Amino acid sequence: MSNYSKYIPEDLAKELLEFWMPMHRYDLGSYDGKPYFDTEDKESPDWESCDRYRIPTYGDVIDWFSSKGIHITFDVFFTFALADNVAYLWKVSYIDESNDDIKLVTISEEDALDGKEGCGGSFELDAQSAIRYAMKLKNLI
């Protein structure tokens, strides 16, 4: 399974829905067995009538940001500090083509090596950090 075909965590999916990322909403009886989240907790009296959304994959989210001019990329590198595993360096870039100038804003961040944040080599944790940064960047533009 590719890293890009893995599903993002439910809390990040809810943040992206609030951020206006379009997501597949299930109609009554249309559930297809893929990971989902409800807009209400099961304990809520409105749970039975709430909306249910399919949780997107990392690839879905990265493609959506790309369609908005925000590009998320990952570079893989090998490091002995991570017990001979690979680690990831992520970059988020914005290209504004609304006028003749192309503007590029980039941040790069190396995966944490100390085990507290990401334990190194974690595509999921790096991708979540990159997506959250892209959300902040989109709010600024």
Feature locations, PLM:
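Charge-rich, low-complexity N-terminal segments
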Residues: 1-48
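Ampiphathic alpha-helical segments that act as solvent-exposed interaction surfaces
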Residues: 108-141
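N-terminal segment of the canonical double-stranded RNA-binding domain
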Residues: 22, 34-117
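Short amphipathic alpha-helical segments that mediate assembly, nucleic-acid/protein binding
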Residues: 9-13, 58, 102, 106, ...
